[in-house]
């Protein structure tokens, strides 16, 4: 048996599964476009507020702090994912892996202390001003 025939014979189940998933997605998208309503009007473009008349604008300006906190959450969440992968393989990695994990945690703590000292975690502006004045002295 040649290599390409062996590869096809080995992966035919995955190929059928992939075709089924793509076919199911195409079927659901096609069915929703056929059965869905096509009327576009003024009421369709208004935000839905549970049957109540809309009050105010749907576009709100958010503080940049929310985006900063979201980015910090994503970064520390990915770091937690790395630590979970290490904890699953702790027996295979031995002491070398343990030391590497400790170094990784130390780097994380250094980053957290830096963010704390800079004031990235402070929500109140007066606390940040006091901390920056103390650092300049």
UniProtKB/Swiss-Prot annotation:
- Where is it mainly found? membrane
GO terms for cellular component = NADH dehydrogenase complex; plasma membrane
Does the keyword Cell inner membrane belong to this entry?
yes
Q: Work out whether the entry's keyword set contains Magnesium.
A: no
Q: How does it sit in the membrane?
A: Multi-pass membrane protein
Instruction: State its Enzyme Commission number(s).
Output: 7.1.1.-
Class of this enzyme = translocase
Out of the domains of life, which is the source? Bacteria
Known catalytic reactions: a quinone + NADH + 5 H(+)(in) = a quinol + NAD(+) + 4 H(+)(out)
Q: Which UniProt keywords apply?
A: Cell inner membrane, Cell membrane, Membrane, NAD, Quinone, Translocase, Transmembrane, Transmembrane helix, Transport, Ubiquinone
One GO MF term on file is: quinone binding
Which Pfam families does the record cross-reference, listed alphabetically? Oxidored_q4
Membrane spanning residue stretches: 12-32, 66-86, 95-115
Q: Where in the cell is it found?
A: Cell inner membrane
What does the subunit comment say?
Answer: NDH-1 is composed of 13 different subunits. Subunits NuoA, H, J, K, L, M, N constitute the membrane sector of the complex.
Role this protein plays: NDH-1 shuttles electrons from NADH, via FMN and iron-sulfur (Fe-S) centers, to quinones in the respiratory chain. The immediate electron acceptor for the enzyme in this species is believed to be ubiquinone. Couples the redox reaction to proton translocation (for every two electrons transferred, four hydrogen ions are translocated across the cytoplasmic membrane), and thus conserves the redox energy in a proton gradient.
Q: Which family does it belong to?
A: Belongs to the complex I subunit 3 family.
Name of the protein described by the UniProt record: NADH-quinone oxidoreductase subunit A
Organism expressing this protein natively: Pseudomonas entomophila (strain L48)
């Amino acid at each position: 048996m040649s290599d390409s025939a062996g590869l096809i014979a080995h992966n035919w189940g995955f190929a059928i599964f992939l075709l089924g998933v793509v076919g199911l997605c195409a079927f659901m998208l096609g069915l929703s476009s056929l059965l869905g309503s096509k009327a576009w009007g003024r009421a369709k473009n208004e935000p839905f507020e549970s049957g109540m008349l809309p009050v105010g604008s749907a576009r709100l300006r958010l503080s940049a702090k929310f985006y900063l906190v979201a980015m910090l959450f994503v970064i520390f969440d990915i770091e937690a994912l790395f630590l979970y992968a290490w904890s699953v393989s702790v027996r295979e990695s031995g002491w070398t892996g343990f030391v590497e994990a400790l170094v990784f945690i130390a780097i994380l703590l250094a980053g957290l202390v830096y963010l704390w000292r800079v004031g990235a975690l402070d929500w109140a502006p007066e606390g940040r001003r006091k901390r920056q004045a103390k650092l300049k002295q």
